[in-house]
UniProtKB/Swiss-Prot annotation:
Keyword tRNA-binding belongs to the record: yes
InterPro entries per UniProt: NA-bd_OB-fold, Ribosomal_uS12, Ribosomal_uS12_bac
GO MF term list: rRNA binding; structural constituent of ribosome; tRNA binding
Keywords in alphabetical order: Methylation, Ribonucleoprotein, Ribosomal protein, RNA-binding, rRNA-binding, tRNA-binding
PANTHER family cross-referenced by the UniProt entry: 30S RIBOSOMAL PROTEIN S12 FAMILY MEMBER
Signal sequence residues: none
Protein name: Small ribosomal subunit protein uS12
Lineage top rank: taxon: Bacteria
Positions where 3-methylthioaspartic acid occurs in the chain: 102
Annotated source species: Streptococcus pneumoniae (strain Hungary19A-6)
Pfam families per UniProt: Ribosom_S12_S23
Gene name for this UniProt entry: rpsL
The protein's assembly and partners: Part of the 30S ribosomal subunit. Contacts proteins S8 and S17. May interact with IF1 in the 30S initiation complex.
Amino acid sequence: MPTINQLVRKPRKSKVEKPKSPALNVGYNSHKKVQTNVSSPQKRGVATRVGTMTPRKPNSALRKFARVRLSNLIEVTAYIPGIGHNLQEHSVVLLRGGRVKDLPGVRYHIVRGALDTAGVNDRKQGRSKYGTKRPKA
């Protein structure tokens, strides 16, 4: 335990909390070609690679992912939720934060039903999360 004198000389530092989705906290001024620190809830990007990835132990699957170059010129890996997708290279996608626990390095989700990403077909429940319109009764 430090003495009062030691604390006077060098006070305690508060912990610095780092963001969970750092690419959303960076903006880009294309006119000045400089990055700014403007946060946004979602970001637009272009898919540069679409593929599958295996999760960490104890799970086993082929999880769909896309490598995305964002509008702020940062390239990130994003998860494609739902069953089936229509994404390919050069598709324009909308990204939100949110990691995938069993995929290392995946900190973002692609928003289904926005921009070039279609919603999930034949989905009856939880439709808003997967960009599916209400079925005709």
